[in-house]
């Protein structure tokens, strides 16, 4: 749940290039999923980028496994939002 460096951030792209959004935390990533172009989500999910970033940058193997293959924007948002709420609750 920490804030990431620019090098660690998730940079949203599409087949034609960067789409102008970068997430510097899991919270911000979930918020940006609501507004990034749908083709960006599809692009990253087809390549496995989201699961890879979650596993290797955020070190959350469970969430990475859960998001693998999910193509529906709302399902991704719901799953990630539930996970981040659980993680925040453990810090309180």
Positions of PLM-derived features:
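Terminal, compositionally biased segments used for targeting/anchoring and flexible tails
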Residues: 1-92
